[in-house]
């Protein structure tokens, strides 16, 4: 059986936490930040756990991470 390939685009966007859940970065934090208040910018800086319905898809894209 051949080795499974990792989706490199997914590998750059997700990392796996200690308890086996995928972590992602939030959107809307790259530019056009001057009209967003500090609270919103701070919240957008926090990493987010990938939703449980998408965890299975991330797991397929990163076969050796879990």
UniProtKB/Swiss-Prot annotation:
Pfam families: Ribosomal_L35p
This protein's GO CC annotations: cytosolic large ribosomal subunit
Record-annotated disulphide pairs: none
InterPro entries registered for this protein in UniProt: Ribosomal_bL35 (IPR001706), Ribosomal_bL35-like (IPR021137), Ribosomal_bL35_CS (IPR018265), Ribosomal_bL35_sf (IPR037229)
Superkingdom of the source species: Bacteria
Any one GO biological process: translation
Name of this chain's protein: Large ribosomal subunit protein bL35
Protein's organism: Synechococcus elongatus (strain ATCC 33912 / PCC 7942 / FACHB-805) (Anacystis nidulans R2)
Gene that encodes the chain: rpmI
């Amino acid at each position: 059986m051949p080795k499974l390939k990792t989706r490199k685009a997914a590998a750059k966007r997700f990392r796996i936490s200690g308890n086996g859940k995928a972590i992602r970065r939030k959107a809307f934090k790259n530019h056009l930040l001057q009209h967003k208040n500090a609270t919103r910018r701070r919240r957008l800086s926090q990493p987010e756990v990938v939703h449980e319905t998408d965890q299975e898809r991330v797991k397929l894209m990163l076969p050796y991470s879990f």
